Amino acid sequence: MAAEDGAKIAAQRIGSGNPVIGKEKAEAGRCRECHGADGNSSDAKIPNHAGQYAAYLVKQLSDFQSGARRHEIMTIMAEDLSAADMADIGAYFADREIMQGDGAGANGLGRNLFDNGDRGRDIPACASCHGTRGKGGIAGNVIYPVIGGQRKIYLRSQLVGWKLGDRKNSPDGVMNKIAESLSDDEIEALADYISGL
């Protein structure tokens, strides 16, 4: 059963796109210039995409295209992509080796919030959606991104964006509700912990 679940999760990670064609499209579309040749960015402000769920990447590209998510450069990069382009590019990055953390993942406050949340403030455990160690792996739960090992500065900026309402494209606004309840110190602790996973 565990092997079946692993195969199912691997298939869900890639989705319906073609990773071989996606590589060609990602290279032609200049994705590698910012997100790295293997989907791991060398710029701390730019997210890693290696090992990310294709469905999540497709949603983000669609949101940039529609204006549901705003970013000056990514809006331009996504504007001419077809649904097939997005699926193929998503499959390519999903098929890359999953991003690895560069920190120790030892922040106690961050770990507690990640593993347990805070019921008194209606903050669910991050792991309940993002999986153990933030690497996904929850069958059928492909719209919540892999966050373990993501860039600390990027993680912090996204949590702050959700808290302030600058980013609003999470399903049912769940990330806005969670981030609004976090203190600046908790955001810093979570970014530090998650980046080290």
Residue ranges and their predicted role:
Residues 42-48, 63-105, 140-145, 163-197:
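Axial heme c-ligation environment in periplasmic c-type cytochrome domains
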Residues 29-38, 89, 123-132, 190:
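The canonical Cys-X-X-Cys-His
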Residues 23-32, 51-54, 115-127, 148-157, ...:
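Sequence context surrounding c-type heme c attachment/ligation sites in exported
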Residues 8-66:
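The feature marks the first
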Residues 1-27, 42-43, 95-122:
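Electrostatic cytochrome c docking/interface patches
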